[in-house]
């Protein structure tokens, strides 16, 4: 919405900077208002389309979170930077259906990936004998969604988590 308002102000500023005659009949202002209303309608359509796609993807995975890979293989620190740059997060499944959606990505690619486990996690999916701190300070998920302790230096599939507050 701010972008639309700024666009309208920019158009008005361009008109005034050109030194054109004063718009006594308000034609320019009315034209700007029409353009602004058009931009608002287009923005509403785009927002609606985005929400439809998001809801469809959420319905298909059973999760309000999306897990996406760029197919790169990186260590934990590189993953953190990549997800941060993409405005995403390192996967942190909080529910069984989220873990299943995450595991579906891993199964499709036949690879393991890092995840983070919060201190107050109500949901966990540790494999038998895990967590095993001797194996490392990080956590990885296998293609079945089971969690294992891992070295943070392991090179695993890059998967970032994206979620939306609707």
From Swiss-Prot:
Record: glycosylation sites: 122
Tissue distribution: Expressed by the liver.
Gene Ontology MF terms: carbohydrate binding; phospholipase A2 inhibitor activity
Gene3D superfamilies registered for this protein in UniProt: Mannose-Binding Protein A, subunit A (3.10.100.10)
Keyword check for Disulfide bond: yes
Subcellular location: Secreted
UniProtKB keywords: Calcium, Disulfide bond, Glycoprotein, Lectin, Phospholipase A2 inhibitor, Secreted, Signal
Disulfide bonds: 83-160, 138-152
Gene Ontology cellular-component terms listed: extracellular region
Pfam family, any one: Lectin_C
Family per record: Belongs to the alpha-type phospholipase A2 inhibitor family.
Subunit structure: Homotrimer; non-covalently linked.
Chain's role: This phospholipase A2 inhibitor binds directly phospholipase A2 in the presence or absence of calcium.
Annotated protein name in UniProt: Phospholipase A2 inhibitor A1
């Amino acid at each position: 919405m701010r972008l639309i308002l700024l666009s309208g102000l920019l158009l008005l500023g361009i008109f005034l900077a050109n030194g054109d005659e004063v718009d006594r009949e308000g034609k320019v202002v009315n034209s700007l208002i029409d353009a602004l209303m058009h931009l608002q309608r287009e923005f509403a359509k785009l927002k609606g389309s985005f929400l439809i796609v998001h809801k469809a993807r959420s319905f298909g995975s059973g999760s309000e979170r999306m897990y996406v890979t760029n197919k790169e293989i990186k260590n934990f620190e590189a993953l953190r930077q990549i997800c941060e740059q993409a405005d995403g997060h390192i996967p942190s499944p909080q529910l069984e259906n989220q873990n299943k959606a995450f595991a579906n990505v891993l199964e499709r690619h036949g690879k393991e990936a890092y995840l983070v486990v919060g201190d107050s996690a109500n949901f966990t999916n540790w494999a038998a004998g895990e967590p095993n701190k001797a194996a490392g300070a990080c956590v990885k998920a296998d293609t079945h969604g089971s969690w294992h302790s891992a070295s943070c230096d392991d090179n695993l599939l890059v998967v970032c988590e994206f979620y939306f507050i609707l």
